[in-house]
Amino acid sequence: MGIMKEISVKALAKINLGLDVVRRREDGYHEVKMVMQTIHLFDRLEMKKTAGGITMTTNLSFLPTNENNLVYKAAKLLMDEFQIRDGIDVKLHKYIPVAAGMAGGSTDAAAVLYGMNRMFELGLSKEELMQRGVKIGADVPYCIMRGTALAEGIGEQLTALPPMVKCPILIAKPQISVSTKFVYENLKLDENTVHPDIDRLVEDIRRKDLAAITSDMGNVLETVTIPNYPVIACLLYTSP
């Protein structure tokens, strides 16, 4: 079989079925407990071998195409570790909403790791790709794993769950961008905070009880986002 010179990879978006923040660690990170699910909304990445270096283009002019993009960081990580002499050109066709909490950047990075592993015949297993992915971002290992999963720690401790019940979903993205840093800095974890029951949600998923799943879904970060961005409440409580 000839050496692969180019590859096209889908980068699937994810949603959080439930998200709780357990505590703030001394190093500033937050420990979370959440259930994540990949969905059939995706970016597409076309990767091609070149003579050398990393080049990147995208259909969205405001996205960086240098080391400030996780796509670039993922490519550089593998090129440095395996001393790859060839270069790579990445064309990113971006369809996942930006700054929407759908892991758009992380899933693109995961797609690059997957694609380069195949193109350059690095022989890395899924688990080995996930180990490298966490160096780029906490969500990257999950975006390599995909499916339905419980995430703990800072999001990198993953437990696979049975597949989610198939159902239609409605994605609503208002014309705002919410800073993750702002949300976590303003999150108050005290006795008055209402936390979603992630353990119960996991059991709902195991039982494939869609009514219970929808009832037990929740996101503790809404205690920050809704007061600061009222449009989110409008979407939550007026959508069909």
Walk through the language-model features, giving the residues of each.
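Gly/Ser/Thr-rich beta-alpha loop segments that engage phosphate groups in nucleotides
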Residues: 20, 30, 71, 101-107, ...
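ATP-binding N-lobe of GHMP and related small-molecule kinases
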Residues: 2-100, 117-118, 122-130, 164, ...
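Short glycine/proline- and acidic residue-enriched helix-loop micro-motifs
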Residues: 211-223
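Short, small-residue alpha-helix embedded
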Residues: 106-119
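Conserved small/polar residues in nucleotide/adenosyl-binding loops
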Residues: 237-240
